Amino acid sequence: MGDDYTPYYARRGDVIELEQPAKFGPKTSLVEMPISWSLDDFPVFEYLRQQNVLQAGLMNAGLVLENWFDDFAYMRDHYDWGVRTYTFHPHVIGRGHRLVMLDRLIQKLREAGATFVMMEQAVAEYRIKFPNGRSERGR
């Protein structure tokens, strides 16, 4: 969750102290992919109630489709290159109306020029495009 649209090299040895600025450790060779709770199906669709927590979930699939697509559209319009990582759990996305929404999302993404690749391919492309681990906002 260190970047919305671009992979990045993970660090090790970060030091976080209360009321102090973070001290970042050195980068490693491990490439992390951009993920976000806002692109995960569980928080938006699943109802979860515990003693001190209520996760409402059960959002309208059409509204979720708009949010997920608009995140891609923003990346497409403002970055020269990037990755959108959607997280789908079979027991969550696998309900009828949600599968219909997922089909619509895939179709809209294709029509908007999205390319679907495996993480391994996205990491390889990132290493070529940003050999020093730098990634900057595009246009």
For each of these PLM feature ranges, what is it?
Residues 1-80, 130-138:
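Active-site-adjacent pocket scaffolds in enzyme catalytic domains
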Residues 55-139:
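C-terminal domain-boundary segment and adjacent tail
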